Amino acid sequence: MDPNDAFSAAHPFRWDLGPPAPAPVPPPPPPPPPPPPANVPRELEELVAGYGVRMSTVARISELGFTASTLLAMTERELDDMMAALAGLFRWDLLLGERFGLRAALRAERGRLMSLGGRHHGHQSGSTVDGASQEVLSEEHDMAGSGGMGDDDNGRRMVTGKKQAKKGSAARKGKKARRKKVDDLRLDMQEDEMDCCDEDGGGGSESTESSAGGGGGERQREHPFVVTEPGEVARAKKNGLDYLFHLYEQCRLFLLQVQSMAKLHGHKSPTKVTNQVFRYAKKVGASYINKPKMRHYVHCYALHCLDEEASDALRRAYKARGENVGAWRQACYAPLVDISARHGFDIDAVFAAHPRLAIWYVPTRLRQLCHQARSSHAAAAAALPPPLF
């Protein structure tokens, strides 16, 4: 008898001496953290690096609560307000290079984000086009196998084409809206520059008048007023001249409000009626006050302020003759030239000396007429013979 059999009989339970079990498979390593998306704005310090903006200035901007995302979403006017607040609250001397450097950094970051977004969009659109082409190929293959095309496939393709056409039209409308917004902002900035030039040199105040008064291909402006006597109320849809002069008084009140708000916020306050005043008037609901209309009749208001009796007599005469407001407007130049002759043909000094006219720019046409009158007066004086005694 085998001794192993005897041991097995004595010990029925016995360890299995087979091959060892395989070692447990170690768990897979955790995936690496996802890289930060490339289309997320960088930190403010990284954004302005290399553009000449001091770190102390960046710290002050951060203390005001501005981040890179906030600055990228701000307009040019809001950036100006932020810089004015930085100079007003912290008394911080913001260098000129820092102002331009910050704007350049924001433009570069916007361009980077737009390029990344366009690349990502192009990749998605490319994959979509590939999928669509594969679907079309498979449908053509099925159609070739079946010998024709079903009505369901035709209807599905028509619906898909309509959806794509709607998406394309929506994208075009969005581009047009963005382009119009940029054009309006550029035009607004150009008008502000024209106002600055008017404050420096006093010229160019009748650019709208010259463009509307004739010449070129501009449409003749329709006069919204009729000639009325003092105290007369106009009928129909047009207004009288008393209402016109009242608009200039309203502009003066709007200028005072803009000046008080500018002083309250520590901004530069305008000394004359500029685009800022017209924008404020539109903002508070006085949309009937606009720059072309007020600049067009400013010399008529000047005659009303300087010599009210002559202005009233002129109104009565033109009302009796049935003249329109355009002829009355042209007739208002001659009395003003006579008034300037008493002050050496210096019409700017005449405007500056009157409290209600000092806030208005002298019309270019009126200044030219005064200059011509001064030249003709000097030529006539030179042609006179010298006195005999």
From Swiss-Prot:
GO BP: any one term: regulation of DNA-templated transcription
Biased composition (Pro residues): 19-39
InterPro entries according to UniProt: FLO/LFY_C, FLO_LFY, Floricaula/leafy_C_sf, LFY_SAM
Annotated positions for site Interaction with DNA: 268, 275, 279, 326
A Pfam family this chain is assigned to: C_LFY_FLO
Keyword tRNA processing: no
Compositionally biased residues, Acidic residues: 190-201
Disulfides per UniProt: none
Protein known as: Probable transcription factor FL
Organism: Oryza sativa subsp. indica (Rice)
Gene encoding the protein: OSL
